[in-house]
UniProtKB/Swiss-Prot annotation:
This is ATP synthase subunit beta. Produces ATP from ADP in the presence of a proton gradient across the membrane. The catalytic sites are hosted primarily by the beta subunits. Belongs to the ATPase alpha/beta chains family. The keyword Zinc does not apply. Its main location: membrane. It catalyses: ATP + H2O + 4 H(+)(in) = ADP + phosphate + 5 H(+)(out). Its EC number is 7.1.2.2. It comes from Alkalilimnicola ehrlichii (strain ATCC BAA-1101 / DSM 17681 / MLHE-1). It is a peripheral membrane protein. F-type ATPases have 2 components, CF(1) - the catalytic core - and CF(0) - the membrane proton channel. CF(1) has five subunits: alpha(3), beta(3), gamma(1), delta(1), epsilon(1). CF(0) has three main subunits: a(1), b(2) and c(9-12). The alpha and beta chains form an alternating ring which encloses part of the gamma chain. CF(1) is attached to CF(0) by a central stalk formed by the gamma and epsilon chains, while a peripheral stalk is formed by the delta and b chains.
Length: 458
């Protein structure tokens, strides 16, 4: 094992000099002997000097400290021993429960499955969340993006999805917290514990306060753990919160390495970095990875290069809108902006497709009529339009749903709504079977029968 010495430290970037015939390869892990800090090789500068990114704080590092090359990339524990544990980017436990005991360790830099190994499927994954199951259904082995600005409920939606899928489908999940709040990571851990699903989730955190190296690589750490389960023949769920922070960490690293920035200050390698991660999140003939990624949208601008690059990789997009959150409708999913490739009569069936398009049609018409109502009032509308508006307002409220993970805030018990009940309920509203009920009866209920019960008490 060759050893070198530190020649320069600039923030998270550390230059290390090795003998010229023993220069480590790109992505190899190096270890600073005295403090056990891991460095990852990013560039070879010539004359035996490599430029590395520190996977931890570089405070107190000094020139000419000894560094050892490991001769291989960063490797992390994989297998059942990771379930129920909180780990950092290096796979080290941070939950004070002792070492993570697994038989194998895998390197975090792996190539994507070949074209021949990949498998496409059109099987639906039921989430129990009405608006998602009806309007932007998830495919097993697909990629889903939760788009939203600050504070519209991306993390809460993600927590609800993990809870529902772990309790209803009994599958394994891997959660990668990329540059999010430590408080959220803590809440998340306790939420999983209280729901008794912690033993089915592996948690990997690289939070906001950590150096950019950790935040850039933590998604790969989580993904490597998920790939192991997939290659065992399982159907895995991979949650990444937040993919924007992955891009942001890449921007910081890129600037520290001295690369020229591109549009809006992002790294010139934005598309390639995103592709490297996304192409590995895929289903093979042995097992599947279904991924749900929260995507922070800077200043609510969907054309920003980061969310725009992410869009290209997704099968379904769930757009969380501030305007809907302001109405008090949660989950604040925009029913007209959210899309899914699975919403096709050949995949979901004629009835589901027609009900979904019917719901969107009514909401679209209501959107068009809103200006007229604002200027002239409801009385100027035709009878047909009045009926459309009344139904649209009921549908809008009925798209809300009490969440299990939000019970502590709302005081209302959570609801899991099976897909067949969702379709039947919306079909009944569209067919006018509930035109006689007041619209507030439809707010924060599960099925339409609950709305009818609620109406009796209003």
């Amino acid at each position: 094992m060759s050893s070198g010495k530190i020649v320069q430290v600039i923030g998270a970037v550390v230059d290390v000099e090795f003998p010229q015939d023993q220069v480590p390869k790109i992505y190899d892990a190096l270890i600073v002997d005295e403090r056990g800090l891991t460095l990852e090789v990013q560039q070879q500068l010539g004359d035996g000097v490599v430029r590395t990114i520190a996977m931890g704080s570089s405070d107190g590092l000094k020139r000419s400290e000894k560094v050892s090359a490991t001769g291989k990339p960063i490797s992390v524990p994989v297998g059942k021993g990771t379930l129920g544990r909180i780990m950092d980017v290096l796979g080290e436990p941070v939950d004070e429960k002792g070492a993570v005991e697994t038989e194998e360790r895998w390197g975090i830099h792996r190539s994507a499955p070949s074209f021949a190994e990949q498998a496409g499927g059109a099987e639906l994954l039921e989430t129990g969340i009405k608006v998602i199951d009806l309007l932007c259904p998830f495919a097993k082995g697909g990629k889903v993006g939760l788009f939203g600005g600050a504070g519209v409920g991306k993390t809460v939606n993600m927590m609800e999805l993990i809870r529902n899928i772990a309790t209803e489908h009994a599958g394994y999940s891997v959660f990668a917290g990329v540059g999010e709040r430590t408080r959220e990571g803590n809440d998340f851990y306790h939420e999983m514990k209280d729901s008794n699903v912690l033993d089915k989730v592996a948690l990997v955190y690289g939070q906001m306060n950590e150096p950019p190296g950790n935040r850039l690589r933590v998604a790969l750490t989580g993904l490597t753990m998920a790939e192991y389960f997939r290659d065992e023949g399982r159907d895995i769920l991979m949650f990444i919160d937040n993919i924007y922070r992955y891009t942001l960490a890449g921007t910081e690293v890129s600037a520290l390495l001295g690369r020229m920035p591109s549009a809006v200050g992002y790294q010139p390698t934005l598309a390639e970095e995103m592709g490297k991660l996304q192409e590995r999140i895929t289903s093979t003939k042995t097992g599947s990875i279904t991924s749900v990624q929260a995507v922070y949208v800077p200043a609510d601008d969907l054309t920003d290069p980061s969310p725009a690059t992410t869009f290209a990789h997704l099968d379904a997009t769930v757009v969380l809108a501030r305007g809907i959150a302001e109405l008090g409708i949660y989950p604040a999913v925009d029913p007209l902006d959210s899309t899914s490739r699975q919403l096709d009569p050949l995949v979901v069936g004629e009835e589901h497709y027609n009900v979904a398009r019917g719901v969107q049609g009514v909401l679209q018409r209501y959107k068009e009529l809103r200006d007229i109502i604002a200027i002239l009032g409801m009385d100027e509308l035709s009878e047909d339009d009045k009926l459309t508006v009344a139904r649209a307002r009921k549908i809008q409220r009925f798209l809300s749903q009490p969440f299990f993970v939000a019970e502590v805030f709302t005081g209302a018990p959570g609801k899991y709504v099976p897909l067949k009940d969702t379709i039947a309920s919306f079909k009944a509203i569209l067919d006018g079977e509930y035109d006689h009920l007041p619209e507030q009866a439809f707010y924060m209920v599960g099925t339409v029968d609950e709305a009818a019960e609620k109406a009796k008490n209003l």
